[in-house]
Amino acid sequence: MKRFYFSLLILITSVSAVFAQKDAKAQAILDKTAAAYQKAEGIAITFGGTQKGTLLLKGSCFYLDCAGVKSWFDGKTQWSYAQQNEEVTVSNPTAEELQSVNPYALITSYKTLFNYHYRGFQTRNGKKGQEVVLTPRQKGEIQSITFTVSADYEPIYIGVKLSNGKTQEFNITSYQTHRNLSSSIFRFDAKKYPNAEIIDMR
């Protein structure tokens, strides 16, 4: 369940088999959001809602601190640290596996994995933005994703409706771009966790 929260973030934080299922307005918003993400370089995000946490992004790399779990990904290797049992799992995830753990997989996967439609202007957490609803082309744990962006095409809100009827909500409280993020931020530093048990799955 802890790992599943990664896929809910701006899954980030982030399509259709049949053209008739596409919505031109929704696609334009998603395309512009993806372009803004690519230009933003280093990004620092804080979020609240169902879970509170911090997310740092740079290209394909990310660092996530949420729900008692910290996760680092340097573009090849992923380290996931569970604070409760002081275990670090190390893996080299495949592209397919990254879809379930990369918090910004939505940014690169919406064109192939989702259908989507435009929902108009909505106010979320006191902020007004344009909203798009995405539905997965294949059935799974996620039933739909509601994605709200500002006039600058930065995420304001993400709501993930699960197949069990529950909804996970993420309100973006801070979104800072062009941050100078060192590559070391996206790698696990064993010296900072001397008591952690390393479980190498590579």
Describe each PLM feature range.
Residues 48, 65, 81-83, 135-137, ...:
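A generic structural motif
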Residues 16-52, 56-61, 86, 188-202:
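N-terminal leader/targeting segments and the immediate start of mature chains
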Residues 36, 52-57, 70-71, 116-123:
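Short, exposed beta-strand/loop patches in secreted or surface proteins that constitute
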